[in-house]
């Protein structure tokens, strides 16, 4: 005996016939469950005739499946309204069951383009897109919470040349993308952040040294502590140091071997590399002092898991280093000192809180892969929904 639920994936259906139809299968069935009025939910009904509804059903193997459902036209004796019978698993005014739409959604999500999938299943490319959009909306309502996460990561990434950059909001606690917003200026983010729920519950926000994002967080997340991303802080220290080196020695600063040695932390150098670097720095005593200062500053910034009392001692050393940079007299070092002074509170929070934006940067790599697989996105909302589904 054929189990209707095993074939159709739907409850309370009775299969009357299964026959070959062209190159596919045609299944005739009827609904045997309870029927009620969709207007008043009354059960006192009078039949006004029969009709047959034909919809596409999920394919069986590689053969397309057509589902023919025998239904009734009913008149409710309570509210005196007439209606056609509704079938569970098939939405009103739809030519395909929910199971078939989920199948199209899954195949399109796996990378089959709309035109090829439409030709294979005998539907239009626009219909494939419509089923896909419905599937995305259904997944969002099931998976994504509207409230803002407690630990948030904010960073920017490039979208298109015409529309520019987009801002990524990442849930650092649960390792998923919370949302993607077009734009990176305070004006473009204003309307979105005003509608955001649960902003007062956010406790920590991690970001790079972007003044725009800092002002946005201070305005819209009043209870959040801002923590600078360690990678970006050390990168900006190296950036100013290398620019200062180019001003002091324009010739040797182009040497890729020396450039690699200058950029690394001292503990990552092999003994022969340390000897080569020491021989070069011996020729420039002033550059040697700057290099040693940079190494001490980087080691100071690399510290983590510190107590409150330990952070107070580190803060004294950090403020002293900032003062020395601002009094150095070299433009690149003075600029670095001003930047660190402007971000001193957010940088000091790195010693106490170990959260970083590495998770967000990793999702940016995945988002770039999504963009390449789709050969680019013109519609930002399509891109946003695809990212939230695959990275959320």
Indicate where each model-derived feature is located.
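Active-site beta-loop-alpha junctions of metal-dependent nucleic acid enzymes
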Residues: 95-96, 177-198, 204
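Gly-rich Lys/Arg/Thr-decorated short loops/hinges at beta-loop-alpha junctions or inter-strand turns
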Residues: 87, 170-176
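Acidic/histidine-rich catalytic cores and adjacent linkers
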Residues: 30, 34, 39, 46, ...
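Short, conserved DNA-binding cores of transcription-related domains
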Residues: 1-81, 87
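Short, positively charged, Gly/Tyr-enriched micro-motifs
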Residues: 54-163, 199-202, 347-348
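Short alpha-helix plus adjacent loop in nuclease-associated cores
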Residues: 233-252
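The DNA-recognition helices of helix-turn-helix-type DNA-binding domains
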Residues: 124, 135-139, 244, 354, ...
């Amino acid at each position: 005996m054929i189990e209707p639920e095993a074939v159709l994936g739907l409850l309370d259906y009775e299969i009357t016939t299964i026959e070959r139809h062209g190159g596919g299968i045609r299944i005739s069935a009827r609904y045997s469950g309870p029927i009620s009025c969709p207007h008043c939910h009354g059960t006192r009904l009078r039949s006004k005739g029969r009709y047959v509804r034909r919809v596409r059903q999920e394919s069986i193997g590689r053969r397309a499946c057509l589902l023919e459902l025998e239904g009734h036209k009913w008149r409710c004796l309570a509210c005196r309204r007439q209606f056609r019978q509704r079938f569970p698993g098939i939405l009103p005014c739809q030519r395909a069951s929910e199971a078939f739409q989920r199948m199209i959604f899954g195949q399109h999500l796996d990378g089959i383009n709309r035109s090829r999938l439409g030709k294979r299943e005998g539907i239009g490319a626009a219909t494939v897109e419509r089923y896909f959009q419905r599937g995305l909306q259904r997944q969002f309502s099931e998976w994504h919470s509207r409230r803002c996460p407690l630990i948030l990561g904010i960073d920017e990434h490039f979208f298109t040349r015409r529309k520019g950059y987009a801002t990524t909001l990442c849930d650092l606690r649960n390792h998923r993308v919370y949302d993607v917003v077009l734009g990176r200026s305070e004006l473009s983010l204003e309307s979105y952040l005003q509608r955001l729920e649960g902003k007062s519950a956010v406790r920590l926000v991690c970001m790079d040294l972007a003044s725009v994002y800092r002002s946005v967080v201070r305005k819209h997340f009043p209870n959040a502590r801002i923590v600078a991303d360690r990678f970006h802080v050390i990168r900006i220290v190296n950036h100013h140091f290398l620019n200062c080196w180019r001003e002091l020695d324009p010739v040797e600063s182009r040497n890729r071997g020396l450039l690699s040695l200058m950029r690394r932390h001292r503990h990552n150098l092999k003994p022969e590399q340390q000897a080569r670097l020491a021989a070069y720095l011996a020729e420039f005593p002033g550059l040697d002092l700057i290099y040693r200062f940079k190494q001490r500053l980087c080691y100071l910034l690399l510290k983590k898991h510190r107590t409150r009392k330990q952070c107070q001692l580190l803060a004294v050393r950090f403020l002293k280093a900032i003062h020395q940079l601002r009094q150095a007299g070299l433009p690149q070092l003075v600029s670095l000192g001003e930047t660190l002074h402007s971000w001193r509170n957010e940088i000091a929070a790195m010693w106490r809180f170990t959260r970083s934006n590495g998770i967000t940067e990793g999702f940016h790599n995945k988002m770039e892969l999504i963009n390449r697989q789709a050969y680019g996105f013109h519609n930002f909302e399509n891109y946003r929904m695809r990212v939230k589904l695959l990275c959320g």
